[in-house]
Structures are given as structure tokens and as C-alpha cells.
UniProtKB/Swiss-Prot annotation:
Job description of the protein: Part of the small subunit (SSU) processome, first precursor of the small eukaryotic ribosomal subunit. During the assembly of the SSU processome in the nucleolus, many ribosome biogenesis factors, an RNA chaperone and ribosomal proteins associate with the nascent pre-rRNA and work in concert to generate RNA folding, modifications, rearrangements and cleavage as well as targeted degradation of pre-ribosomal RNA by the RNA exosome. Its dissociation from the complex determines the transition from state pre-A1 to state pre-A1*.
Lineage of source species: Eukaryota, Metazoa, Chordata, Craniata, Vertebrata
Location of Phosphoserine modifications: 121, 142-143, 204, 214
Family: Belongs to the SAS10 family.
Organism field: Homo sapiens
Region entry Necessary for interaction with EIF4E, spans: 41-174
Protein name, per record: Neuroguidin
């Protein structure tokens, strides 16, 4: 009775699956027939195909054959225990899973080849359109000059005169090769959120909370501001370079101003009540603090009509 109840409960779902299977088999059969006719007519050349795709198609076909055999035995009331088709299905499935990473690596190249074979040309946004060409690295003017020199040589040979060779030519730098830029606004926003999360995870608040609730032993270190630590590392690197190369590196005005501002920031007391922005971790709106905004210099505008001051000559 229990088996009869299970059979009655599974009967509607089994009928639905059989109907879906019949529809899918009919659709696949029609697609295969149309492809076979096109291949036989010569619409799709197959003499130079990919062996990887051929092996994959053969494995999928064998998998479907064994699966159909199992469905037939199951519908006839047979047992699947120790069935040879089950072992073959497991083996083919393992091979297909091993081929999946290779399929992901070849997906772009295969799609590009298929699209090129169907349309006859590459896409406008294809990155391979912007690859460097050796012909673009050569100056067009130099080739024209060479042609003119050859024409002059021919004329001089005809008239009995010798042309002067080895004249220096003007150097023309090669043009820059265009690069496709396909970054969207969503990708830029994602990168900005990732930078905000990294900045929040490296803040002093998160570090202190981690040390408070962690079971690891406390690490005692010199608590300094990150920009002070970075500045000391740069100074040490500069000192090591000067001592090893026996040279004195010059410091620009911009570097001096940056060090001066860093010293002022480290000496101010407003940082005692300042907490880093961790809204990227809590799901809030990420915003920049006043200290994170870049400092812009005022552009000096020259005043017209004013002469430079000079030394007055004494009489």
C-alpha cells in the first residue's frame, strides 16, 4: 500500500517530465536535421574544425545514449543496480567536468571564430582591433622619402649621374595606437566601493575592535599615524639610496610642502575625536571626509599693466 501511494504521488510529476522530454527531443531533432542539411550543402565548412569541440560533442552524444538506455530500463521496471550504463555515465560526467576549465579558457576564442565565420568580420568593440601593428610603428614619411630616393636613383642612372646617398632624414615619432575602453559606470562604482572597504578595514577603529575581541596575544607596536609611517619609510629608502650611490638627492618644493602639511596634520589635536568612515562595511552611503579631499593649489593669474620692480640707480 505504501508503494502504491508513492507511485500515485509521483505519477503527475512523471507525466509532466515525460511531456517536457518529448517536446525537447522534438526540438533537438529538428535543430540537428537543419544543421545536417546545411553541412551537407556546404554552408558550414567543417574540414578545419577544433578537435576539442569534436571530442566534447562525442562525449555529450554518448552521455545522451546511455541516459536514454537507463530511462528505457527504468520505464520497463528493470533494476539499475550494477548496470553498465551507470558506470559509463559516471566516467563521461567526470571527463566533462575536467574539460570545463579548458572550455572557459577557450570560450572567447571560439565565440570570436564563430562570429567571424557567420558575419565575415570582427566586431567594432573587439579588443583585437586595437592591437599594435608593426606597420604603424614605421613612419610614412620615411617610406615616401625612400620611394623618392629610388626614383632619383633611376633618373640618375638613366642620365649618367650618381645620386647622393646617406642624407640624414627628419625623425618622425610613431603615432599612438588606440586602445578600446569599455569600463562602465557600474564597474567604476564597484571599484570605488572596494577601495572604500579596504580603507575602512585598515582604519584604527576596526583594528582596535579586532584586537579587543580576538583571542590572539596582543601585539605591542609603535602607534603612529599611517602617513607618518609611510614618510619614515620613504626617508629611510632615500637615505639608503644616497649612501649606496654616493649621491645627494634633491627635494622638490612640492615634496617639501607635502612634508610640512604632514607634520601639521600629525600635530593637530582634532584627530583625537576623529573616526574613520566605515560606512562601506555597514551598508551606508560612502562619502569622503574633509581630510581625504585633495588639496588644490590656487592658480596665480598674472596682472596686466604692472611692470617688474627693478633696482633704482643712484646718482
Amino acid at each position: 500500500m505504501a508503494a502504491l501511494g508513492v507511485l500515485e504521488s509521483d505519477l503527475p510529476s512523471a507525466v509532466t517530465l515525460l511531456k517536457n522530454l518529448q517536446e525537447q527531443v522534438m526540438a533537438v531533432t529538428a535543430q540537428v536535421k537543419s544543421l545536417t542539411q546545411k553541412v551537407q550543402a556546404g554552408a558550414y565548412p567543417t574540414e578545419k574544425g577544433l578537435s576539442f569541440l569534436e571530442v566534447k560533442d562525442q562525449l555529450l552524444l554518448m552521455y545522451l545514449m546511455d541516459l536514454t538506455h537507463l530511462i528505457l530500463d527504468k520505464a520497463s521496471g528493470g533494476s539499475l543496480q550494477g548496470h553498465d550504463a551507470v558506470l559509463r555515465l559516471v566516467e563521461i560526467r567526470t571527463v566533462l567536468e575536467k574539460l570545463r576549465p579548458l572550455d572557459q579558457k577557450l570560450k572567447y576564442q571560439i565565440d570570436k571564430l564563430i562570429k567571424t565565420a557567420v558575419t565575415g568580420s570582427l566586431s567594432e568593440n573587439d579588443p583585437l582591433r586595437f592591437k599594435p601593428h608593426p606597420s604603424n610603428m614605421m613612419s610614412k614619411l620615411s617610406s615616401e622619402d625612400e620611394e623618392e630616393d629610388e626614383a632619383e636613383d633611376d633618373q640618375s642612372e638613366a642620365s649618367g649621374k650618381k645620386s647622393v646617398k646617406g642624407v640624414s632624414k627628419k625623425y618622425v615619432p610613431p603615432r599612438l595606437v588606440p586602445v578600446h575602453y569599455d569600463e562602465t559606470e557600474a564597474e567604476r562604482e564597484k571599484k570605488r566601493l572596494e577601495r572604500a572597504k579596504r580603507r575602512a578595514l585598515s582604519s584604527s577603529v576596526i583594528r582596535e575592535l579586532k584586537e579587543q575581541y580576538s583571542d590572539a596575544p596582543e601585539e605591542i607596536r609603535d602607534a603612529r599615524h599611517p602617513h607618518v609611517t609611510r614618510q619614515s619609510q620613504e626617508d629611510q629608502h632615500r637615505i639608503n639610496y644616497e649612501e649606496s650611490m654616493m649621491v645627494r638627492l634633491s627635494v622638490s618644493k612640492r615634496e617639501k610642502g607635502r612634508r610640512k602639511r604632514a607634520n601639521v596634520m600629525s600635530s593637530q589635536l582634532h584627530s583625537l575625536t576623529h573616526f574613520s568612515d566605515i560606512s562601506a562595511l555597514t551598508g551606508g552611503t560612502v562619502h569622503l571626509d574633509e581630510d581625504q579631499n585633495p588639496i588644490k593649489k590656487r592658480k596665480k593669474i598674472p596682472q596686466k599693466g604692472r611692470k617688474k620692480k627693478g633696482f633704482r640707480r643712484r646718482r
